[in-house]
């Protein structure tokens, strides 16, 4: 009995060689449509066009090709049901043994900057998903392939099984098929929700693996890196120029570093941030990038060992030389100058990456909890002082405003309870992750030491009591920036006035857990 294969693909990678082997090695008869049939015929492979197979022409400009009983009957027929076989015979329908379908490139289409809604709509596949789902449903009786990477394993299984495909193989292909259509529909729903400015009580998440990581946060935890969308973006689009394979912890720290450097546009002062365990240990700005890095390093040279460095400008030779003076895990910047690349290459295990757009972060963040997950808008608004309020008698100078803004940008990216002490565009002390705010204040001030005299202090949350203000003043802090919003704000304001401090309320809290 002849075997029939239905081929209709958008991704034509490996198509001709695969189809030729089906025909020459395994005596398949191929039914195909549109561009797939055209390519196979041009390659000299015998093909029956879908219109010939069904006896019905393509209509509506190709919108209706495969939606026909002779196609779907051949896919959905159960070989072990007499009534199904009788229906096939009565309607002269040939059952398919193999269906090879992948879908219109919707995600690649919407990734184009100039795409219109009409363009996107035309790339919503109808017949393809119908064939994929029907084939996956009936995997007990046929095989569905949705990715060119499956072609060689299928041919191997066919040869090893003397023409029979094992059920386990068909099951895996069916699962991949349903994942394929689910991801496709999720991409469409997400895009249309954005276009229609609509909200929904359902959330579709779709992702594909980029890399299986060596392990997660700890060696006993398995981990995989996924990207959203068919087109690589964010870290999936970054270029790793050298060094060891990225780890789970590297990626987590790199993302935190990206978020900090996104606060400092490349057309402003040079900026450098050094992170350890998802927290900044040194952040600095300067005219020269090498100076910004050195100041960030000197801010906490002990913690910088084994750290992650993010820079807002192309790495030059001077900065590269400075960074080779200590052990670092990763460096990321918009680009690397050739002379700098030669210098960094001496550190073979050092991971060096370029990321074209530091503002390419997600619009929402997702966190797993038992039985589900939480979704929130990303805290990625660029900070300005426009809506800030001076709440003390003492007023900030023009220079103070710049330093208050710098400190506020930094503390936003420190784990709560978060305190940052800064001066002249450099962090002097950072208190992170303490269970009480005054505890973080004390840690930051202890790190700053004598340098706290005349410095700025930023807090990611309000002060519940005036103890933090008094502790800061005793160390020499001259200005504080915080969200405000405590029931006891008046106590903190009174303490600041009593001690001659400037205090500014931003009106925005930046908890980070």
From Swiss-Prot:
Protein's GO biological process: 'de novo' IMP biosynthetic process
Q: Which SMART domains match?
A: AICARFT_IMPCHas (SM00798), MGS (SM00851)
Keywords (A to Z) from UniProt: Hydrolase, Multifunctional enzyme, Purine biosynthesis, Transferase
* Keyword Transferase applies: yes
Q: Which InterPro entries does this chain map to?
A: AICAR_Tfase_dup_dom_sf, Cytidine_deaminase-like, MGS-like_dom, MGS-like_dom_sf, PurH-like
Q: Where does the record place the MGS-like domain?
A: 1-146
Q: Which cysteines are cross-linked by disulfides?
A: none
Gene Ontology molecular-function annotations: IMP cyclohydrolase activity; phosphoribosylaminoimidazolecarboxamide formyltransferase activity
Q: Which Pfam families match?
A: AICARFT_IMPCHas, MGS
EC number(s): the record gives: 2.1.2.3, 3.5.4.10
Reaction(s) catalyzed by this protein? (6R)-10-formyltetrahydrofolate + 5-amino-1-(5-phospho-beta-D-ribosyl)imidazole-4-carboxamide = 5-formamido-1-(5-phospho-D-ribosyl)imidazole-4-carboxamide + (6S)-5,6,7,8-tetrahydrofolate; IMP + H2O = 5-formamido-1-(5-phospho-D-ribosyl)imidazole-4-carboxamide
Entry keyword annotation includes Hydrolase:
yes
Q: In which pathway does it act?
A: Purine metabolism; IMP biosynthesis via de novo pathway; 5-formamido-1-(5-phospho-D-ribosyl)imidazole-4-carboxamide from 5-amino-1-(5-phospho-D-ribosyl)imidazole-4-carboxamide (10-formyl THF route): step 1/1; Purine metabolism; IMP biosynthesis via de novo pathway; IMP from 5-formamido-1-(5-phospho-D-ribosyl)imidazole-4-carboxamide: step 1/1
| Any single GO CC term annotated in Swiss-Prot or TrEMBL for this entry | cytosol
Record's domain comment? The IMP cyclohydrolase activity resides in the N-terminal region.
Similarity annotation: Belongs to the PurH family.
PANTHER family on file: BIFUNCTIONAL PURINE BIOSYNTHESIS PROTEIN ATIC, BIFUNCTIONAL PURINE BIOSYNTHESIS PROTEIN PURH
Tell me what this protein is called. Bifunctional purine biosynthesis protein PurH
**Source organism phylogeny:** Bacteria, Bacillati, Cyanobacteriota, Cyanophyceae, Synechococcales
